[in-house]
């Protein structure tokens, strides 16, 4: 693996979707860190997150979507209203989020979370 910044950027921009999913990991809150013995976990729709940086800092909300193409997360609390009344979500980078509650209805995700790291 190269150390060159241009090759690192190229790898990020040209990564396939199944590999982008792992880079969409969000840090766990302190109590979740203790419970699951891991620092971060890939985010998905249905998780609850807290925004720790940016204009929406301190806002908690459910994840409404994950944009793998642009490496962004859409959070329910970080939205504005358009003129016609519809919601416009502000895309947020996963590094600016902390996972507060994990959506565990998915069995494979449950196994991945409890797997030894």
From Swiss-Prot:
GO terms for biological process: translation. Keywords: Ribonucleoprotein, Ribosomal protein, RNA-binding, rRNA-binding. The keyword Oxidoreductase does not apply. CDD domains: KOW_RPL26. PROSITE patterns: RIBOSOMAL_L24. One of two assembly initiator proteins, it binds directly to the 5'-end of the 23S rRNA, where it nucleates assembly of the 50S subunit. This is Large ribosomal subunit protein uL24. It comes from Methanosphaera stadtmanae (strain ATCC 43021 / DSM 3091 / JCM 11832 / MCB-3).
